[in-house]
């Protein structure tokens, strides 16, 4: 791909500025982290709620490959610690397989009305992720709910998912995430 590898810019300790294409990537990611933190706090304290005015209790991430493995590993590594330290906020589920039985199995374990879904696709065109999004949206609609009130996107600013009214919010990553030198 002949791009910088800057996935480390998503971490909490960003260090020095990294300038690429004339843009301070550290400033970009610091801003995105602040937006994500603000959104998460609003979900946890009940400022962002479902269409019935009720808090979300579960988060379900839809992604594949790198859009699934890191967040899943982090959740599994920290879940018991968070529970032991009384900082556990929400149960997390993950949909990353295009087998409809797998997605249906995950969906069957959640209370759809109290679940917020995170769709993760850098390009916004990943077929497997979009297939699972369609499956989940159908399930939300069958429950008499509005998918736009239950979904957020994590994508690049140039993706079809960006600035899209079908999502409560969108958070951005750069093309340098997953880049190869």
List each language-model region with its residue ranges.
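Extended, charge-enriched "interface" segments that sit outside catalytic cores
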Residues: 1-51
């Amino acid at each position: 791909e002949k791009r910088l590898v800057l996935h480390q810019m998503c971490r909490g300790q960003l260090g020095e500025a990294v300038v690429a294409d004339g843009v301070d990537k550290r400033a970009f990611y610091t801003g995105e982290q602040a937006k994500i933190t603000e959104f998460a706090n609003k979900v946890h304290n009940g400022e962002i709620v479902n269409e019935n005015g009720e808090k979300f209790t579960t988060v379900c991430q839809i992604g594949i490959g790198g859009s699934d493995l890191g967040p899943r590993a982090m959740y599994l590594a920290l879940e018991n610690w968070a529970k032991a330290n009384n900082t556990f906020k929400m149960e997390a589920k993950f949909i990353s397989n295009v087998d409809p039985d797998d997605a249906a199995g995950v969906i069957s374990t959640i209370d759809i009305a109290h679940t917020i879904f995170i769709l993760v696709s850098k390009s916004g065109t990943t077929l497997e992720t979009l297939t699972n999004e369609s499956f989940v949206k159908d399930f939300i609609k069958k429950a008499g709910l509005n998918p736009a009130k239950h979904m957020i996107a994590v994508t690049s600013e140039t993706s079809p998912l960006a600035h899209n009214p079908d999502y409560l919010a969108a958070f951005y990553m750069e093309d340098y995430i997953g880049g190869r030198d």
